[in-house]
A protein has these predicted regions:
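Rossmann-like S-adenosyl-L-methionine
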Residues: 1-191
């Protein structure tokens, strides 16, 4: 397991039992990235838990988080876990995506309740990665964002709801999005 240190201003899943299910599902969706040269973006990375779970399967993981204290905790956590292929950047995803030179092979999204900033969505989609894992804590913002992904060439392959807070209306959802291949379309020839 990972050693994790969190601060009072950092977000972290409070239900550790279902958080384990959530993180394991995300890790399973990522699967084998196919090599140590692959780069993963973990956008809205918090204290870096997901990034660190992905690190053994990737050449590099870049986490982006707006809360500076969470980024500092992520850096310390990666060091404590002996992970030297994790980089964490403090900043707004919308702005940081314009500054990062690396291009991802896969993207993991775990945005706040309001979902992804509408101006960040086109930037994320423009990378054209084959797979995106989207973790959402609010179904309405998830649906809104998924519509944009679907309109731009992605499809939902898998989705799992994780009940983080039993007896409440809150649910976390883990979605695997995949780029539609040519095989996903039906062509009709009119003679």
């Amino acid at each position: 397991g990972l050693k994790l240190k969190i601060s009072t201003v950092s977000f972290f899943q409070t239900n550790s039992y279902s958080a384990e299910v959530l993180y394991r599902t995300a890790r399973d969706y990522v699967g084998d990235l196919g090599g140590s040269d692959k780069t993963v973006f973990d956008l809205y990375s918090g204290t870096g838990t997901i990034a660190q779970l992905m690190a053994p399967a990737a050449g590099k993981v870049i986490g982006v988080e707006i809360v500076e204290e969470a980024v500092e905790a992520a850096k310390k956590n990666a060091a404590a876990n002996g992970l030297d292929n994790c980089e964490f950047i403090a900043g707004d995803v919308l702005k940081v995506l314009d500054e990062v030179e690396e291009k991802p092979d896969m993207i993991i999204l775990d945005p706040p309740r309001d979902g992804i900033h509408p101006k960040a969505l086109p930037k994320i989609i423009a990378y054209g990665v084959d797979h995106i894992v989207y973790i959402s804590c609010k179904p309405t913002s998830l649906v809104r964002d998924l519509e944009v992904f679907l309109e731009n060439g992605y499809r939902v392959d898998k989705a799992v709801a994780v009940d983080q807070f039993p007896w409440t209306a809150n649910v976390e959802t883990v979605v695997l999005l995949s780029w539609k291949s040519v095989d996903d379309f039906m062509y009709v020839d009119y003679a």
